[in-house]
Regions:
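C-terminal non-catalytic interaction appendages of large macromolecular assemblies
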Residues: 134-139, 144-148, 152-198
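Secondary-structure boundary/capping signal
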Residues: 22, 73, 176-177
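Unusually extended, aromatic-enriched hydrophobic runs near protein termini
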Residues: 47, 97-123, 171-196
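N-terminal, charged low-complexity regulatory/assembly segments
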Residues: 1-65
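Generic detection of intrinsically disordered/low-complexity segments and helix-coil linkers/edges
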Residues: 4, 22-23, 130, 163, ...
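Amphipathic interaction/junction segments at domain boundaries or subunit interfaces
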Residues: 53, 64-153, 157
């Protein structure tokens, strides 16, 4: 499997902080990730996109780091990996939105991406409340990030992925408003997403 940002960041942590154990930690990470992938091999292609890119490498890194540090520290380190990618994403999107008028298209892009990448085939259950006229408002009732983290006994890890949305989309443009007051990963019964033109 090709390297993900999570596996790269994990290997960097292992090499820098635990050089004498890095080989063993990498082997454990690889074996755990391989097992997680095998256990989820029957998932749909759409769900595999999320599992392979973020969820399963995140779980493998989190579990592996707990072999050499307390659980809370391992959680903060994996959160840092996800946060770093989100900050990069935010910077790239904000730069793109310097193109005059482009910000107006963002809610409609969110509608399309929700339907194609974050739909039922991928394990999500989006309820569209308001789409069009510069507004994307969706309640996500089910999420494979939350479900998979919970299934593997680490529901607290899901908050890293929830936080990445807020980091990526808050303050992208003066005329765009990102709102979310609830997430499944933070213990609520839904994620109430909203991106709208001011």
């Amino acid at each position: 499997m090709k390297e993900t940002y999570l596996s790269r960041d994990f290997r960097e942590t292992a090499a820098q902080r635990f050089p004498s154990q890095a080989k063993e930690l990498n082997a454990f990470f690889d074996a755990r990730l391989h097992a997680l992938l095998a256990e989820n091999a029957e998932a749909s292609k759409e769900k595999q996109y999320h599992l392979k890119r973020q969820i399963l490498p995140g779980i493998a890194a989190y579990e592996t780091l707990q072999r050499v540090m307390p659980k809370e520290e391992a959680l903060q380190i994996v959160h840092g990996y996800v946060e770093r990618l989100a900050r990069t994403s935010h910077k790239q999107l904000a730069t793109l939105l310097l193109i005059p008028g482009l910000y107006r298209l963002v809610p409609s892009v969110f509608v399309k991406s929700t339907r194609s990448v974050f739909g039922p085939a991928a394990g999500f259950d989006p309820k569209e409340l308001q789409v069009g006229n510069g507004i994307w408002r969706v309640d996500m009732m089910k999420c494979p990030y939350h479900d998979t983290c919970t299934e593997y006994g680490c529901p607290e890890l899901c908050r890293s992925f929830c936080d990445s949305d807020d980091i990526s989309y808050t303050g992208l443009h003066p005329k765009l408003i990102w709102e979310r007051s609830m997430t499944l990963g933070r213990g609520n019964d839904r994620c109430d997403f909203c991106m709208k033109v001011r």
